[in-house]
Amino acid sequence: MPTYNQLVRFGRKSKIRKTKSPALESNPFKSGVCLVVKTVTPKKPNSALRKIATVRLSNKRTVNAYIPGEKHSVKEHDRVLVRGGQVPDLPGVKYHIVLGAYDIAGVKGRKQGRSRYGATRKQVAATKK
């Protein structure tokens, strides 16, 4: 416990919190250009081929970003929008690519959780009585 005089002289130091997505620089999203699209295997005990892309952001930083959903249209040199969000079983992947933004199409045939995958609502035909 500090003395009153110590508080007057030095004050209280607030804890510095470390950000989980430093490359975004406190922005919700950053745009970038896709450099490489590849598949990686997750940590134990999971098994899959997860799709990731190496992206050069508009602030000149290079990050690995996860491509969510089934099937994707991400190619080299595509413009992408990147948001924060880690992938639990992929070490070093701290970002997600936003589907349905810029050059990236949304997941086709998606009925639930559409907003996360950039899928549009299927129009139901009006029936006559």
UniProtKB/Swiss-Prot annotation:
Q: Does the keyword Ribonucleoprotein apply?
A: yes
GO BP terms: translation
**Gene Ontology molecular function terms on file:** rRNA binding; structural constituent of ribosome; tRNA binding
Q: Which SUPFAM superfamilies match?
A: Nucleic acid-binding proteins (SSF50249)
Q: Which domain of life is it from?
A: Bacteria
User: Which cellular components does GO assign to this protein?
Assistant: small ribosomal subunit
Keyword list (alphabetical) reads: Ribonucleoprotein, Ribosomal protein, RNA-binding, rRNA-binding, tRNA-binding
Q: Which cysteines are joined by disulfide bonds?
A: none
Which Gene3D superfamilies does this entry report, sorted A to Z?
Nucleic acid-binding proteins
Q: How does it assemble?
A: Part of the 30S ribosomal subunit. Contacts proteins S8 and S17. May interact with IF1 in the 30S initiation complex.
Q: Which family does it belong to?
A: Belongs to the universal ribosomal protein uS12 family.
**Protein task:** With S4 and S5 plays an important role in translational accuracy.
Query: Protein name, please?
Result: Small ribosomal subunit protein uS12
Source taxonomy lineage? Answer: Bacteria, Pseudomonadati, Pseudomonadota, Alphaproteobacteria, Rickettsiales
